[in-house]
């Protein structure tokens, strides 16, 4: 994200405004979370040079809680988002990448070997660039992504079934 003179100060963050200004609580190990939100004005948004999300960008946390990944797709209702200085935007330049595949690889990467800092862990971009990601042909990436989607749906269905079973068990005990 932009770390320049126009970086938002605490008195320039609002509970409602034009552009959602992401913090580390918004990017979790499971993707985006909007339980807590802070916004900047349109004027402040225009002053910042870097860190504006575009649809289908991937956000990676690089300071504090390192390695959390979120995907900015059409399911995210906010149209204007910016990352803070402890995050990176990954915007693939090549069309032969399946975003779901890349997100899975990023979420399951062990960043510990390239993290520096003991008080506040960080993943400098220079070290991040040295990480090699597996890149099979697009057909295999797509097959893997479809499989992960199927597993996610099955896991969700199982979680619902367990909740229903627990609720019915509670009522049968009463």
Give residue ranges: language-model regions.
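Short, basic/aromatic beta-hairpin or loop at an interaction surface
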Residues: 26-39, 81
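Low-complexity, Lys/Gly-biased intrinsically disordered segments
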Residues: 1-30, 44-48
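A generic structural signal for short beta-strands and their flanking turns/coil linkers
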Residues: 18, 36, 84-86
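A short glycine-rich beta-alpha junction/loop motif
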Residues: 14, 79-88, 100, 117-139
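Amphipathic alpha-helical coiled-coil/heptad-repeat segments
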Residues: 132-174
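Active-site/binding-pocket entry motifs
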Residues: 27-28, 65-66, 112
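A short beta-sheet element
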Residues: 23, 43-107, 124
């Amino acid at each position: 994200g932009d770390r320049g003179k126009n970086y938002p100060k605490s008195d320039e963050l609002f509970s409602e405004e034009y552009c959602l200004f992401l913090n580390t609580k918004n990017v979790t190990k499971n993707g985006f979370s909007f339980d807590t939100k802070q916004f900047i004005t349109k004027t402040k948004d225009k002053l910042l040079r870097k860190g504006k999300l575009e649809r289908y960008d991937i956000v990676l946390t690089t300071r504090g809680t390192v390695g959390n990944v979120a995907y900015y797709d059409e399911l995210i209702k906010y149209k204007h988002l910016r990352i803070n200085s402890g995050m990176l935007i990954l915007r693939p330049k090549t069309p032969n990448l399946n975003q779901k595949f890349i997100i899975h690889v990023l979420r399951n990467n062990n960043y510990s070997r390239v993290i520096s800092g003991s008080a506040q862990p960080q993943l400098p971009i220079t070290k991040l660039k040295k990480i090699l990601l597996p890149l099979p042909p697009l057909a295999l990436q797509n097959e893997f992504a479809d499989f992960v989607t199927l597993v996610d749906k099955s896991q969700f269905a199982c979680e619902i079934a367990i909740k229903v079973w627990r609720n019915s068990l509670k009522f049968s005990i009463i």
